[in-house]
């Protein structure tokens, strides 16, 4: 038999629930505001005490209302925050199960894809998915089984809020950890994100891919082309993350395709540059935008990446030699349509010349004494000193400085000139240093 006190508490609960059931949109928002203010941070037992062991009855009502109105575009933030109080409460697994039983995960994922729902509401939906994913492996699997990876990745690509995008990254990282059944699905979803039009989404996807790659192990065949395509970006912070991922990927089974791809980018296809020439003849204003042509941006980024890889690993430098990287670098140095390609290719070539006497000999013969002396004086500003004839000499070079072109390359044929190499590295990476200094401010 219940006590008078318990009966009074039950009566208050029933009165509260009846008020909710009879309330319109405005009053329900007021009820939720009060609920959030008085119950945020409470544990499961504390919520039960607050609702006289009937907290689930209120959760079901709030969730049902969410499912009824979420497609209308009405504000959902208070509803989602109220549900979050239940799901995040300590000792609240019961609430989570009740939320999932009535299709909570599917509702949260569908919210992400509805255009008329505002960004803040979608961010709250992501936060609830984070809570669910952090509860355990089977809940991560449930999200993935509900086509969650695709919905979450598409939202990351379309989101206009950097803060929201960072919340999505946290969710994707959670889904790739401790989720062996679906970690490959998350990994492929991240790769699919790379061509998207949002620089922030690209950057976050690249960062998360580094983590995912170390967990998954085996690489997906499409990752090479996707990452190399990202090098055409005009955004230095995206380029930086792409190069960082490439530095990891060369330790996997895509090492050779990656290196071949980078060397190939040094020499854009003739059809691409021919298209540009035709446009220039028909529209002189195109001249002002050639520095942003994707193939030239890729060319410059490839020269930078090759320099970083070669400086970090001498064995890689030798592999690059065998892929005729010197020929490609000199060709890029002759690209008068893109000065940054010339500058970065020149700095990278300087390293190979310093490290390999074989390269030094062939480059000197190909350039001629006058041009080679200009190169030695200051590789970084060589592009400002050369004329059109010298540029043509570089672009049309026939250098074939590979290990096959001499008897051998061993330690005795490698020059370690640390002083000038350090100077080259400073000039070579100054874009990244500027970027990092800004991010620290």
List each model region and its residues.
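Intrinsically disordered, low-complexity regulatory regions
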Residues: 1-72, 81-83, 248, 270-295, ...
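Charged catalytic carboxylate motif
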Residues: 78, 124, 167, 204, ...
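Core register positions within helices of long alpha-helical scaffolds
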Residues: 82-86, 128-131, 170-174, 208-211, ...
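Solenoid-like repeat scaffolds
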Residues: 117, 158, 195-196, 229-233
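A short glycine-/small-residue-rich loop at the edge of a beta-strand within enzyme catalytic domains
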Residues: 218, 233, 253, 293, ...
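Eukaryotic modular interaction domains in large regulatory/scaffold proteins
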Residues: 226, 241, 260, 264-270, ...
């Amino acid at each position: 038999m219940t006590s008078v006190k318990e009966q009074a508490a039950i009566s208050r609960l029933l009165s509260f629930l009846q008020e909710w059931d009879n309330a319109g949109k405005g009053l329900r928002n007021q009820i939720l505001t009060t609920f959030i203010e008085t119950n945020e941070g409470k544990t499961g037992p504390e919520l039960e005490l607050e609702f006289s062991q009937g907290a689930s009855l209120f959760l079901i009502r709030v969730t049902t209302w969410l499912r009824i109105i979420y497609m209308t575009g009405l504000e959902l933030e208070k509803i989602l925050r109220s549900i979050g109080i239940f799901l995040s409460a300590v000792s609240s697994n019961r609430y989570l199960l009740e939320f999932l039983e009535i299709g909570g995960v599917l509702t949260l994922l569908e919210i992400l894809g509805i255009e008329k729902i505002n960004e803040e509401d979608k961010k709250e939906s992501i936060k609830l998915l984070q809570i669910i994913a952090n509860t355990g492996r089977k809940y991560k699997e449930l999200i993935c089984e509900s086509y969650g990876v695709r919905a979450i990745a598409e939202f990351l690509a379309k989101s206009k809020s950097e803060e929201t995008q960072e919340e999505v990254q946290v969710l994707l990282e959670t889904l790739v950890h401790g989720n062996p059944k679906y970690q490959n699905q998350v990994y492929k979803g991240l790769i699919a994100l790379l061509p998207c039009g949002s620089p922030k989404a690209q950057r976050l996807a690249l960062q998360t891919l580094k983590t995912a790659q170390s967990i998954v192990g085996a690489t997906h065949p499409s990752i090479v082309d996707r990452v190399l395509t990202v090098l055409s970006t005009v955004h230095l912070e995206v380029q930086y993350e792409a190069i960082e991922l490439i530095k990891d990927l060369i330790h996997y089974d895509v090492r050779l395709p990656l290196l071949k791809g980078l060397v190939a980018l040094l020499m854009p296809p003739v059809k691409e540059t021919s298209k540009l020439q035709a446009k220039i003849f028909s529209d002189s204003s195109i001249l002002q935008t050639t520095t942003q042509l994707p193939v030239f941006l890729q060319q410059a980024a490839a020269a930078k990446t090759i320099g970083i890889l070669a400086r970090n690993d001498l064995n890689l430098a030798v592999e690059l030699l065998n892929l005729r990287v010197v020929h490609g670098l000199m060709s890029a140095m002759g690209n008068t349509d893109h000065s940054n390609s010339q500058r970065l290719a020149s700095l990278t070539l300087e390293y190979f010349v310093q490290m390999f006497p074989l390269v030094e000999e062939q480059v000197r013969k190909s350039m001629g004494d006058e041009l080679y002396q200009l190169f030695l004086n200051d590789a970084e500003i060589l592009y400002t000193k050369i004329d059109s004839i010298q540029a043509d000499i570089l672009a049309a070079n026939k250098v074939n400085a590979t290990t096959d072109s001499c008897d051998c390359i061993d330690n005795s044929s490698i020059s370690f000139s640390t002083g000038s190499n350090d100077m080259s590295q400073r000039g070579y990476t100054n874009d990244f240093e500027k970027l990092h200094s800004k991010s620290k401010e």
